[in-house]
Amino acid sequence: MFRRPSARSAPAGPSEGAGRLDLAPFRRLLGYTRPYAWRLVLALVASSIGSLLFLAFPVVVGDLFNNAFGAGSTRALTGWAVDLFGGSAGEGIGGTTPADLNAIALVLIAVFALNAATTYVRVYQLGHVGEGVVADLRRELFRHLLGLSTRFFETRPTGEITSRLTSDIATIQAAVSNVLVQLVSQSVSLVGGVVVLFVINARLTLVMLAVLPAVIVAAAVFGRRLRKISTAFQDELAAANARAEEAISGIRVVQSFTAERHEADRYGEAIRTAFASALRRARVRALFVPSVFTGFLMGIGLVLWYGGRLALAGDLPPGDLITFLLLTVTVAGSIGAFTGLYSQVQEAAGASRRVFELLDARSDLPEPARPTALDAVRGEVRFEGVRFRYGDRGDAWVLDGIDLVANPGEVVALVGPSGAGKSTLVTLVPRFFDPVEGRVTLDGVDLRELDPHDLRHHVGVVPQETLLFSGSIAENVRYGRPNASDEEVVAAAVAANADAFVREFPDGYGTLVGERGVKLSGGQRQRIAIARALLKDPRILVLDEATSSLDSESEALVQVALERLMEGRTTFVIAHRLSTVVDADRIVVLDAGRIVQVGRHAELLAEGGLYRDLYEIQFRDVDA
């Protein structure tokens, strides 16, 4: 199946490590900031300077009050301004002049201006880093997903995958762009604030710090609970998105069975489950915020009570009490920011684990370290003792002992009852799966020894249900060869019998086909797919019941285009219509995963057996 990440690098599951903070995902996330390292450093420096300036504000305000009321001398921080701007316009209380107050006010203005400048630098640079990291992570995740095997996408709902690309990575963005800088800036504010508080009054500082242990314990308890609930919420929201994706992509089936209410109820139930988790998360936050805030208020209340007693006793100037109060609020804010960061980290932990789980997923189709080069491909495809089963669908063999050779340029038709293994057999040709036993070769080389991209460059597939992308007709044809010229696109459409109907549209080849080609008919979509395959010009062609869902008129046009497409190419046709079977070089009859008959149409009819039974059931009316 899929190789899981190693124990050392794998992120924890939803319950694993739920009682502790796992920093491994965040160390890994920091690796994505390397291309923006100088911007991150600049943001860190600006944030540190801003934090120091914010610490200067209470000190300057305290000096302003002490000087205004003659309660103390000017501190070194504002002394240079008093010396520079101070005058003798008249003596005030305690020898302080109005010019001294003016100088201190100028310091305040300078602090505010510098703080505004550092805030601008920090916010802009962090925004650049955060958006850049998220864009890089989304690109890497999407590119990685495209390289995984078909089996991966069969076991993962599309909505779940898109949820990882959108909501989970958005949750990570705040952690990447904010946590590190906030950690540094709040550390500067906390440590610097506590140091200044000790300088002002050590006893009062100890009283204030007595409240901290209770606040930290509360943050840890609530943070652990919040992490569990947030992980569950993200999982439930992804499940809801998966259901919505299914219903929207199959809207015609939903409406044809009048199942709108059923799908709405299914999605509504999934949303109600996610909503219940969201409410649990809201309740935890609602308890967490006031609990921590109450602890802060208790600390501030203690400072006011004890500091007021010191001021009344003359042991603490009133300006210093104001400075102490402002710094206490700053320290409390820093502690609150740390608890908020802890919650943010806890919420992002679940999202980052899920994203990295996808990034760590490995395809069950390993690429060779030194792939064999494909030069001139002749197109001989050989199945040697091939046995295959899906594993997750039971232990029965879907293909059992297949030995088959398709010579270069030969058309091989595959027929048999439903579930015989026809579609599974052709999926082995472009190596969407590997056989469990035996091997498949191209020109004598095991497909597992080839680069999958190189192999698939030489294989073209036209399925029964054609998927077009929501662009123009020209873009969909050019999908077979992106660098093709407009003339080559038109030539491929002409060969596919598509040019005539394309030119009937007002916008011609610029006509938008809609999501999955919904604006075109089935026959038109099929001819666009054939033009796409013609432009790719593969050596090997796989036609998976390419005309079975078309009406007679569309089938005739598509059949002519297919005959042009098959010229000179090794072709596997899962046959459903008589015309394709009659013209095949060989017809291979499958039943229960085994080859039971091989031959041309007339030979198999004369031989009898399963093929003639299928012919009599399916083809007699057409032949008549």
Q: What do the PLM-derived regions correspond to, one by one?
A:
Residues 8-19, 69-73, 131, 139-163, ...:
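Short intracellular "coupling" helices and adjacent cytoplasmic loop segments at the cytosolic face
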Residues 39-52, 181-232, 303-316, 333:
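Transmembrane helices of ABC transporter permease
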Residues 14-22, 45-46, 53-69, 107-158, ...:
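Juxtamembrane helix-loop junctions of ABC transporter transmembrane domains
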Residues 30, 34, 150-151, 167-176, ...:
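An intracellular "coupling" helix at the cytosolic face of ABC transporter transmembrane type-1 domains
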Residues 374-624:
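ABC-type nucleotide-binding domain
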Residues 22-37, 161:
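A short amphipathic helical element positioned immediately N-terminal to and/or at the very start
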Residues 40-117, 198-203, 301, 305, ...:
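Transmembrane helix-loop-helix hairpins at lipid-water interfaces of multipass membrane proteins
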Residues 196-210, 280, 284-353, 358-359:
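Helix-loop-helix
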